[in-house]
Amino acid sequence: MKIKTRFAPSPTGYLHVGGARTALYSWLFARHHGGEFVLRIEDTDLERSTPEAIEAIMDGMNWLNLEWDEGPYFQTKRFDRYNAVIDEMLEAGTAYKCYCSKERLEQLREDQMAKGEKPRYDGRCRHSHEHHADDEPCVVRFANPQDGSVIFDDQIRGPIEFSNQELDDLIIRRTDGSPTYNFCVVVDDWDMEITHVIRGEDHINNTPRQINILKALNAPVPMYAHVSMINGDDGKKLSKRHGAVSVMQYRDDGYLPEALLNYLVRLGWSSGDQEIFTREEMIKLFSLGAVSKSASAFNTDKLLWLNHHYINTLAPEYVATHLQWHIEQENIDTRNGPQLAELVKLLGERCKTLKEMSQSCRYFYEDFSEFDADAAKKHLRPVARQPLEVVRDKLSAITDWSAENVHHAIQATADELEVGMGKVGMPLRVAVTGAGQSPALDVTVHAIGKTRSIERINKALGFIAERESQQ
């Protein structure tokens, strides 16, 4: 049997982490079995679906590199197909027209709740022989079996059973002629030959209804797997304050897709004690049987740790392709300075996100207008004049500009003046970077370049002289 899965988001908002994890699990299951992965946009909610949300979903899938083999399919472009199937069901007697007014249904609901009963349609029109005009408004309901039960073997949770007496005669077409979500899903899964439906646990109650419709259509019933919820680290339902933002917000905040994928795959699935997984390892090891039935807790610190790991272990050239976007957001002109791959090597240990990296690298490429006030007050004092002058001259004398030779110049200055390296290094760091923190000084000065470093040392000396004249 050829395995075929699908990810079917509703474009009523952004692609959030819960949806991204569902997409990842569906994608991994298909790839593990050499099957196919379908992207389907369930946009039947015409009032809430937006082009912006569709674009956000596609952007998120592309950024995560969860490539699909078919689609994207749009339900709004398949209304003719859905209505044709509904008409066949009306003809076969597995569906019927319901003319009950909104007022009657509301009264029925109130009466049932007053008796402590579960609100459900009472089947009045199912058994009615009243004649109605062709243009009289009506909905179409599915004639759900009235006895027996629906049992399905959830691939994560095990067997689940629902009594048909608990299930309603579901509306499958509204009065305006539009088909409803639960029906469209069934026809889509049938037409697209989906073998495994992997989705959130909030869909468990939809599953028996959808299975009954599939059986009424004599269609094959796929396997179902319902993934548990993601909670915040406080055990409460995940919300924006926990980090439940769009996938693309994580991109904007400086995360690598590899870090987010690695984090999401472990958010409910495990393979021994392994924490770090390449994409290839995820595909090889993934199984639905290893997915937890319990809710997972979202931990931003763990995600940040993974991101820092990937910044420092992926090829710098690759990380640089993602860093480029952040550099552009900061409007940094990188034509004069180190290649971005070199920047990744320089700042990788210090920066946990690419956003942080882009916001702390400007001095490598552009001159700064002023020194950090605290750093200058502490390190650009009259006592720093001589170390800066001596190290400037030694840097000027270097013919083979390298980090090693820069280090020798700094060391030689400290030796000549008989002072510790910090007496030379800290004033030099503030002089060339404008601040009191940077990567190792030799590689920093080397990356900034000989001419620019000497110019900045002279600027710092001028700053010291000006401060002296004001005292």
From Swiss-Prot:
Record motif 'KMSKS' region, residues: 237-241
InterPro entries: aa-tRNA-synth_I_cd-bd, aa-tRNA-synth_I_codon-bd_sub2, aa-tRNA-synth_I_CS, aa_tRNA-synth_I_cd-bd_sf, Glu-tRNA-ligase_bac/mito, Glu/Gln-tRNA-synth, Glu/Gln-tRNA-synth_Ib_cat-dom, GluQ/Sye
Residues that bind Zn(2+): C98, C100, C125, H127
GO CC terms of this entry: cytosol
Residue ranges annotated as motif 'HIGH' region: 9-19
Single GO molecular function: glutamate-tRNA ligase activity
Cofactor requirement: Zn(2+)
Primary residence: cytoplasm
Swiss-Prot/TrEMBL GO biological process terms: glutamyl-tRNA aminoacylation
EC number: 6.1.1.17
Location in or out of the cell: Cytoplasm
Key word Ribonucleoprotein present: no
EC main group: ligase
Transmembrane segments: none
Catalytic reaction equation(s): tRNA(Glu) + L-glutamate + ATP = L-glutamyl-tRNA(Glu) + AMP + diphosphate
Entry keyword set: Aminoacyl-tRNA synthetase, ATP-binding, Cytoplasm, Ligase, Metal-binding, Nucleotide-binding, Protein biosynthesis, Zinc
Record text on cofactor binding: Binds 1 zinc ion per subunit.
Function statement: Catalyzes the attachment of glutamate to tRNA(Glu) in a two-step reaction: glutamate is first activated by ATP to form Glu-AMP and then transferred to the acceptor end of tRNA(Glu).
Assigned protein family: Belongs to the class-I aminoacyl-tRNA synthetase family. Glutamate--tRNA ligase type 1 subfamily.
Name the record gives this protein: Glutamate--tRNA ligase
Organism: Salmonella paratyphi A (strain AKU_12601)
Gene name for this UniProt entry: gltX
